Amino acid sequence: MLSLSNGVISIRVDENLGGEIRSIKMGKSEFLADFDWSSPIQSSKSSTYGSAILDWLSEYRGGWQVLFPNAGNENTVMGVPLPFHGEFGRTETTVVSKKKSELVIKAGTRLPLVLTRTYKLVPNKPILQIKQSVSNESDSPIPFIWGEHPAFSLPRGSKINLPTGPILVDANEMGELQDVKPGSTGTWPTVPDRVGGQIDLSVVPEADIERLCYLHDRPEGWAAMQHGKKVIGISWDLEAFPHLWFWQEIGGKGFPWFGRAQITAIEPASTWPSFGLEAAVKSGQAFYLKPGEVRSAWTTFSVSTVAAKDIMKIKSVDSKGIFH
């Protein structure tokens, strides 16, 4: 586990798990969901659960993963089996460089792709900049999809500010606490519930719930969230991540949560729904890299000076992490 700090905020990055960000802290505030669970036992420390999804979930303890070169369902591409959410997030990376407030890691994948990620804390500011690039080391065009998977620890009742846009609720049943209607559509912030009413997704509910929605074809790449007395934000490269997965797991009873999780995940993504790379190739949503080609993307996390009560007055968050 590697630590970075600029004197204002600090982060912890697990170089042995694809550069997963385990913590983003400012003073006593921890902005990411971070679970120190002894169970369920991780598949890597025991044996497989017989499912790529369950194996991935057995390792999950919150935090911020990168999904690459697959996101969503396990599938097979070019004869290569790709696990749920891609193998990068469960891969031991190489540390290219490490400074007090900057870290560079890289690793290859099952496909002939290499992903390099740079984490930089802006001097004297509560801003984390993530830059990444993927290169094709083969002599053939190679497809991929990617996404960011940050799970935030937003308290119940917190407000979420996002640009308006279309929503699709995932068609699958998430669990007994799902309150959104599977397969329904809406416009941010409202979607149909299961009994003929409407649900406002811009407020983290007080009740236990489970939700997965796709805020597809985003008009702008940013979100602002109330976290106690603070306002946090995330902005992203809209060309790399034109869609957003919106996932909430609050008090869910199933594996691996068992009622212990409180997660609101705002996930910039290159595809929707979460069908995986094989489906993205068929639907035309996959990116392709030519031999030797490199593609880059950025994501920024920041903490605002805007008062929590004024969160809905925010009009945008730019690539530098500045709120407007």
Where in the sequence are the language-model features?
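Surface-exposed acidic/polar loop and edge beta-strand patches at domain peripheries
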Residues: 1-129, 140-145, 150-324
